[in-house]
């Protein structure tokens, strides 16, 4: 079985914590032009109270054509090289990492009120730490509405979560330290 059982992470709180800390998702989506997947990177915000991710993309992004389809959201956490020198040369080199994979259904948002709500949530969340915080209301409503016409607003409803946390769980305590 791959990944090995000791690297699999099933604790939903840990999976959600990684997604919140590293919100840039690589999204694999079906491509109507071929059997290949299209891939795009999109920052998303997970709303745990509703169990949905929210995001927006350019109107011409292929993801905007995936309404009612299933996609994969891939999140990568911290990663690093593990040198054998950390274990007195008793192990082979390795790479430590954590990742989360979410299968989700796509819902393209059509309501202007919902689009504005999503933009407000995204900007207020991602503007944290900036002083002063920029607000979408700094843009006149007519300009916002014109900009929204160039975007597709999306909700992703998760149907399956899985994680792969390869953090030397199979190594001795000395190597893990």
Where do the PLM segments sit?
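Short, structured beta-strand-loop surface elements
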Residues: 59-118
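Short beta-strand segments
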Residues: 22-59
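A residue-level signal for conserved active-site and pocket-lining positions in enzyme catalytic cores
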Residues: 33, 104, 154-156
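C-terminal edge-of-domain segments
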Residues: 109-177
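Short, basic/aromatic recognition patches
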Residues: 1-26
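A general structural signal for short secondary-structure junctions and capping/turn motifs
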Residues: 16-18, 63-65, 144-149
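A generic structural micro-feature
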Residues: 36, 94-98, 148
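A generic structural signal for short beta-strands and their flanking turns/coil linkers
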Residues: 23, 40, 49-53, 67-71, ...
């Amino acid at each position: 079985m791959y990944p090995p059982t000791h690297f699999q992470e099933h604790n939903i709180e840990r999976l959600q914590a990684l997604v919140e800390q590293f919100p840039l998702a690589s999204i694999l989506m079906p491509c109507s032009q071929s059997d290949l997947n299209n891939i795009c990177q999109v920052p998303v915000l997970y709303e745990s109270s509703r169990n949905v991710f929210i995001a927006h993309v350019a109107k011409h992004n292929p993801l905007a054509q995936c309404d009612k389809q299933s996609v994969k959201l891939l999140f990568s956490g911290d990663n690093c090289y593990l040198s054998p020198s950390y274990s007195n040369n008793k192990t082979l080199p390795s790479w430590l990492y954590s990742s989360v994979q979410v299968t989700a259904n796509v819902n393209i948002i059509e309501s202007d009120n919902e689009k504005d709500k999503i933009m407000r949530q995204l900007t207020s969340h991602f503007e944290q730490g900036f002083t002063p915080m920029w607000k979408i209301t700094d843009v006149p409503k007519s300009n916002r509405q014109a900009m929204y016409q160039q975007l597709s607003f999306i909700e992703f409803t998760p149907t399956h979560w899985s994680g792969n946390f390869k953090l030397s769980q199979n190594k001795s305590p000395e190597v893990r330290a």
